[in-house]
């Protein structure tokens, strides 16, 4: 389908850490990631970093909270959701979103009719304001 959300990778650190301001400050640091994510791939590009992979984002965030990691790299909505659910007491996101990844609704290859119907519904929701309401509800911020 047409994209309904644009995401990207972001860095999360302990709330009181002012030494890491973004991705460029991660050289030589301990980075926690979620297995099989683009964040795990990106962390592998950091020079002299010790990257530890976890089964889920909560475990990676706990590693940060417990002092076993200096930072977590994951998709922006994943980390922002973690912060909204109480993680903001201990952590914060820093720096700019590192890349751009569009989210869409997958349909079976060749099912052009369904894809067109989905795209039409998305366009209608954007036109009538429903998309903006849902975006704010589920992503916790205004569409930029």
Task: Tell me the role of every PLM-derived stretch.
Residues 14-30:
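Flexible hinge/capping segments at coil-to-helix
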Residues 26, 64-65, 105, 118:
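Hydrophobic residues within well-ordered alpha-helices
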Residues 14, 34-37, 56-57, 73-83, ...:
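Beta->alpha turn/N-cap motifs
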